[in-house]
Structures are given as structure tokens and as C-alpha cells.
From Swiss-Prot:
Keywords: Blood coagulation cascade inhibiting toxin, Disulfide bond, Hemostasis impairing toxin, Myotoxin, Secreted, Signal, Toxin
Gene Ontology molecular function: calcium ion binding; calcium-dependent phospholipase A2 activity; phospholipid binding; toxin activity
Free-text function comment from the UniProt entry: Snake venom phospholipase A2 homolog that induces local edema a few hours after injection (5-10 ug) in the hind paw and shows weak anticoagulant and myotoxic activities.
Predominant subcellular localization, coarse grouping: secreted
Disulfide-bonded cysteines: 42-130, 44-60, 59-110, 65-137, 66-103, 73-97, 91-101
InterPro entries per UniProt: PLipase_A2, PLipase_A2_Asp_AS, PLipase_A2_dom, PLipase_A2_dom_sf, PLipase_A2_His_AS
Gene Ontology biological process terms in this record: arachidonate secretion; lipid catabolic process; negative regulation of T cell proliferation; phospholipid metabolic process
GO cellular component: extracellular region
Protein family according to the UniProt entry: Belongs to the phospholipase A2 family. Group II subfamily. N49 sub-subfamily.
Pfam families assigned to the protein according to its UniProt record, in alphabetical order: Phospholip_A2_1 (PF00068)
Signal peptide: 1-16
Protein name per UniProt: Basic phospholipase A2 homolog Ts-R6
Highest taxon listed in the record's lineage: Eukaryota
Length: 137
């Protein structure tokens, strides 16, 4: 069980309440987020930064930048409120952590829209081979 929690923390460098983000990604992609995206490419996972290796990795880069713009909430730990309407994720308009929800919704949607770029060989892409980007956001 402890190993699963550690893996959950690795997810996307994850931030966004972990269970809520996991649920969104699972809904949009039908993939197990921790195993599928936790160490994907150069930008998914802890301390991820660099030139994206593909569209899926670009989703993580955008997500990292999105979290960098969040104010007033701790993306890793603060809950937010959302609902599902007609298959879409709708973040509660007046919730103080709505911005975190929108970041998580965007990455889940991006993963779904980039399923055709997802490659198993990038799951454990060596971060040492990632090219730094001067202005990642």
C-alpha cells in the first residue's frame, strides 16, 4: 500500500488532489494514470522539465505550467469540487481551488486527445536525455 502512495505522488509531478486527478485521467483515457503517465517522457512525474518527446508529454508540460500559475491553493493537497455532465468535467465555478480543477481537467482532456501519440517506450524515458527548455511556459 505504501508503494502505491509513493507512486501516486510521482504521478505527473502530481499535484491536483491526487485521487481527483487520477479519476479524471482514468475517465478520459481508460488508462491507469500512475502506471501509464507517472514517469512518462521528460515532463510527467517529479521534477519533469524539458523538450516534450511527443504530444502526450506536451500535456504534462502544459500541466506543470498551469500549476505554476495557481494562487491560493496547494495543488497537491487541496480538494476541489467538480461534476460530470454529459460526459464532460465541470469545475465548480465558485470553489476557491477552481483553477487547480481546470488544470487537471485540461491535462486529462489533453491525454485523451493525444492517445495516438502515446508510446509505451516513453513510460520510463530517461530524464538525463531530456533537453532543457529555456522558457518552458
Amino acid at each position: 500500500m505504501r508503494t502505491l502512495w509513493i507512486m501516486a505522488v510521482l504521478l505527473l509531478g502530481v499535484e491536483g488532489h491526487l485521487l481527483q486527478l487520477r479519476k479524471m485521467i482514468k475517465k478520459m483515457t481508460n488508462k491507469e494514470p500512475i502506471l501509464s503517465y507517472g514517469k512518462y517522457g521528460c515532463n510527467c512525474g517529479m521534477a519533469g522539465r524539458g523538450q516534450p518527446v511527443d504530444g502526450t508529454d506536451r500535456c504534462c508540460s502544459i500541466h506543470n505550467c498551469c500549476y505554476g500559475k495557481v494562487n491560493g491553493c496547494s495543488p497537491k493537497w487541496d480538494y476541489y469540487t467538480y461534476s460530470e455532465e454529459n460526459g464532460d468535467i465541470v469545475c465548480e465555478e465558485k470553489h476557491p481551488c477552481k483553477d487547480v480543477c481546470e488544470c487537471d481537467k485540461a491535462v486529462a482532456t489533453c491525454f485523451r486527445d493525444n492517445l495516438d501519440t502515446y508510446k509505451k517506450r516513453n513510460i520510463f524515458h530517461p530524464k538525463s536525455s531530456c533537453v532543457k527548455v529555456s522558457t518552458p511556459c
